[in-house]
Design a protein with these regions (language model features):
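Substrate-positioning beta->alpha
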Residues: 90, 170-185, 195
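N-terminal Rossmann NAD(P)H-binding glycine-rich loop of SDR-like oxidoreductase domains
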Residues: 4-24
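Glycine/proline-rich active-site loop of Rossmann-fold NAD(P)-dependent oxidoreductases
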Residues: 156-161, 186-195
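Active-site beta-alpha turn of Rossmann-fold NAD(P)-dependent dehydrogenases/reductases
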Residues: 71, 106-109, 150, 200
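Flexible, glycine-rich beta-alpha linker
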Residues: 148-164
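NAD(P)H-binding glycine-rich loop region in Rossmannoid oxidoreductase-like domains
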Residues: 5, 36-92, 96-99, 187-188
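Conserved Rossmann-fold NAD(P)-dependent oxidoreductase catalytic core, especially the SDR/UDP-sugar
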Residues: 27-29, 35, 77, 81, ...
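Core catalytic loop region at the nicotinamide-binding pocket of NAD(P)H-dependent oxidoreductases
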Residues: 189-209
Length: 209
C-alpha cells in the first residue's frame, strides 16, 4: 500500500485530495501548520504532522512513497510569503524528497507558470515563484508530475477535464474538486510520471489522462 505525503493538507485542494485518498483506503501523511484544521478528518490511515513550512520539515517524508505539494501562501499574503512558501518551501520539499528516494513527486502549480514574463499583473511574483519551483523539480532526479490548473472555482466535480487551454481566458477555469480528483487519479497511476500539463474543466474523462 502506498503512503502519500500531502504538503498543504489543510488547504482546499490538499484537504479534498486527502479525503479522496483515504476513501480509497490509502495511507496519507498530512503536513499542516495547524492540525486543528483537520479536525473533521478521522481515519486510522491518516497521520498528521504539524510543522511550519518555513522550518525544517524533512521528517515528514520518512516512510512515504510519493508526495503531493499543494501548499500555497494564499492570496492575502505579501511577496515575502510567496517567496518563502511557493518557492522556497517547494524547493526544500523537492530536496527532501530526493534524499528520501521518493518515487513520485506531484506539484500543484498554476497556469502561467511556464512563462511569467507574459503576465503583467499582480500575479507575476506568484507565477515567478511557481516557475522556479517547477524548474527545480524538473531538474531533479525525481519522477514528477506538474499540474498547472486554470482559475480555481468552487464548482462540484464534473469529473471531466481538458489539458488544452481554452481560447477565452474566461473559460480557463477548473474546479478545485476536479483538481483533487485528478491528483488522486495520478497518485494511483504509476505511468503518470515526468509530465507537465495545464488543467481545465472540459469534456474528457479524468481517466483519459
Amino acid at each position: 500500500m502506498s503512503k502519500t505525503l500531502i504538503i498543504g493538507a489543510s488547504g482546499q485542494i490538499g484537504k479534498m485530495t486527502s479525503k479522496l485518498l483515504l476513501s480509497k483506503q490509502q495511507q496519507v501523511v498530512a503536513l499542516v501548520r495547524d492540525k486543528r484544521k483537520l479536525n473533521d478528518l478521522d481515519s486510522s490511515l491518516l497521520t498528521i504532522v504539524e510543522q511550519d513550512l518555513e522550518a525544517d520539515f524533512s521528517h515528514a517524508f520518512e516512510g512515504c512513497d510519493q508526495v503531493i505539494f499543494a501548499a500555497g501562501s494564499g492570496g492575502n499574503t505579501g511577496a515575502d510569503k510567496t517567496i518563502l512558501i511557493d518557492l522556497w518551501a517547494a524547493k526544500k520539499a523537492v530536496d527532501y524528497a530526493e534524499r528520501q528516494n521518493i518515487k513520485h513527486f506531484m506539484m500543484v502549480s498554476s497556469i502561467g507558470a511556464d512563462n511569467p514574463e507574459a503576465v503583467d499583473t499582480e500575479l507575476k511574483p506568484y507565477l515567478v515563484a511557481k516557475h522556479m519551483a517547477d524548474q527545480h523539480l524538473l531538474q531533479s532526479e525525481l519522477h514528477y508530475t506538474v499540474v498547472r490548473p486554470g482559475t480555481l472555482t468552487d464548482e462540484n466535480a464534473s469529473m471531466h477535464i481538458s489539458t488544452v487551454r481554452p481560447d477565452s481566458q474566461d473559460d480557463a477555469k477548473v474546479s478545485r474538486e476536479n483538481v483533487a480528483n485528478v491528483l488522486t487519479y495520478i497518485a494511483n497511476k504509476p505511468h503518470q510520471k515526468n509530465t507537465v500539463f495545464e488543467l481545465f474543466d472540459g469534456t474528457n474523462a479524468i481517466s483519459s489522462l
